Design a protein with these regions (language model features):
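Short, glycine- and charge-enriched coil/turn segments that flank and shape catalytic ligand pockets
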Residues: 8-13, 48, 71-80, 199-217, ...
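A glycine-rich phosphate-binding loop feature that marks nucleotide/adenosyl-phosphate handling sites
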Residues: 119-121, 170-171, 204-210, 299-303
Length: 339
């Protein structure tokens, strides 16, 4: 393979991080030495004791040697190579998006289908460092606020692919506004109302009006769009859709005022059913982000982990009328903040 065609193939393999990867290759490929003489530690080059293998050559091969390469018929290799998505830090993007594909192309081995460089998690606009004293210990955070809270906060606040500033104060704000108020409070309110006014059952007689159809139609074509966005690592779209869905659901429940519809049971039942359906849909969507809390929320409907199907998001009558609903414990406690 000539240098020009090799360069073309390499450029074609770079599907993300164009600013870093494309510019490097478009300048023109230069020879890369795969050995070093400036130090002695490393894998010796055969027949030349003065040289050791360049660390980025032998280190990168671990991705396939761990899968039993060169035995390409091994089950591990067959199942996991080529990788659908290879996620690495942006500071080592060049080695993974240029050198590694170059090595694989030269050896006629399949390339990862996509390489994605994530950003850094910053504290006060700086990389975390013990010497600077700006480290947030993830174990301490998890012990204090819970794993789901930290996971949700990072996914929502750190735009995938970019650097993101985090702080304990912002985490607490996120827990209070999104998880405790928007999600947890909605689950508690509609469940308590249904237990009291619908005999602890999913309402039987319902009749959707324009307001109900409007909010339910937000989920009409969402499945394919979500799949497309996730395939392109657009996590922001996914989380923002959930946040907006919860905002709309709370607004719907407040605006419809089911507590003032006790003389119109058909309307009351429909409002409760619609809100419960949205709680179910959003709990399904939240499962990849806050799995433990989502499963707790689904106990309202006696649903379990294996009942979670993305395809059912568009089904507006997934819940079985007349089936029992249960009260649940508080999903997220509000964080008391000292003024």
């Amino acid at each position: 393979m000539g240098r020009k065609s090799f360069s073309t193939n390499l450029i074609n393999s770079l599907s993300v991080n164009e600013e870093t990867a494309y510019k490097f290759v478009e300048k023109g490929l230069k020879d890369l030495s795969i050995s070093r003489t400036s130090f002695s530690w490393g894998i010796p080059v055969p027949n030349n004791k003065k040289h050791v293998i360049y660390v980025w050559l032998d280190a990168l091969t671990n991705y396939i040697s761990a899968l039993k390469f060169p035995n390409t018929n091994d089950k591990l290799y067959q199942e996991f190579w080529p990788a659908d998505l290879h996620v690495i830090g942006k500071d080592i993007l060049r080695f993974h998006a240029i050198y590694w594909p170059a090595f694989l192309l030269a050896a006629k081995i399949d390339l990862p289908k996509k390489v994605y460089g994530h950003g850094w998690i910053l504290s006060g606009d700086e990389k975390m460092s013990k010497s600077k004293g700006n480290i947030l210990d993830p174990i301490e955070i998890i012990n204090k606020y819970g794993l789901d809270s930290l996971r949700y906060y990072l996914i929502k606040e750190v735009s995938f692919g970019n650097d993101g500033n985090i702080s304990q104060e912002r985490l607490e704000d996120c827990i209070n506004s999104d998880l405790a108020n928007n999600f947890g409070n909605l689950c508690q309110r509609v469940t308590a109302f249904a237990i009291k006014n619908c005999d602890s059952k999913i309402p039987k007689q319902i009749e959707f009006n324009e307001d109900d159809h409007k909010i339910l139609n937000n989920y009409k074509d969402i499945i394919e769009l979500i799949r497309e966005k996730i395939d392109n690592q657009d996590i922001n779209f996914y989380i923002n859709f959930i946040v907006n869905s919860l905002f709309e659901a709370n607004k719907y429940f407040n605006d419809q005022e089911p507590w003032n519809k006790k003389e119109d049971l058909l309307r009351l039942n429909t409002i409760v059913f619609t809100t419960l359906e949205i709680v179910r849909k959003v709990s399904f969507l939240l499962y990849p982000i806050i799995p433990e809390s989502s499963i707790k929320a689904l106990k309202i409907f006696n649903l379990k982990e294996n009942d979670i199907l993305l395809s059912s998001i568009t089904n507006h009558e997934f819940l079985k009328s007349g089936s029992e609903i249960n009260s649940i414990d508080i999903l997220f406690k509000k964080v008391e903040k000292n003024d």
